[in-house]
Amino acid sequence: MYKLTLCILTLSFLLLSGLSNTVLARVQYESPSQRNKIGKEVWDQTLLRDLKIGASGSNSGRAPSCNNSCKPNRP
């Protein structure tokens, strides 16, 4: 009976101490209105959507010496 009581008390202590650790380890969420500088916060999807980066398409084509030899052979 003594071992069972000691085991239950130990497990309860470990469970309760683990709960306080998870509360302390949580990351606090900041709404977009609270953000001051871009360098401080984590780059998430909302920041990436806000940044508009324009890039022109590629003008590359096939090499002039590549006739039919560049195409893969299919059985």
UniProtKB/Swiss-Prot annotation:
GO terms for cellular component: apoplast; plasma membrane. A motif (SxS motif essential for MIK2 binding) lies at residues 56-58. Residues 1-25 form the signal peptide. It is found in: Cell membrane; Secreted, Extracellular space, Apoplast. GO terms for molecular function: LRR domain binding; receptor serine/threonine kinase binding. Disulfide bonds: none annotated. Keywords: Apoplast, Cell membrane, Cleavage on pair of basic residues, Membrane, Secreted, Signal. Residues 56-75 have a biased composition (Polar residues). It comes from the Eukaryota. Mostly expressed in roots. Its main location: membrane. A motif (SCOOP motif) lies at residues 52-66. Residues 54-75 are annotated as: Disordered. The keyword Membrane applies. Interacts with MIK2 (via extracellular leucine-rich repeat domain); this interaction triggers the formation of complex between MIK2 and the BAK1/SERK3 and SERK4 coreceptors, and subsequent BAK1 activation by phosphorylation. Belongs to the serine rich endogenous peptide (SCOOP) phytocytokine family. Brassicaceae-specific phytocytokine (plant endogenous peptide released into the apoplast) perceived by MIK2 in a BAK1/SERK3 and SERK4 coreceptors-dependent manner, that modulates various physiological and antimicrobial processes including growth prevention and reactive oxygen species (ROS) response regulation. Inhibits root growth. This is Serine rich endogenous peptide 20. It comes from Arabidopsis thaliana. The gene is PROSCOOP20.
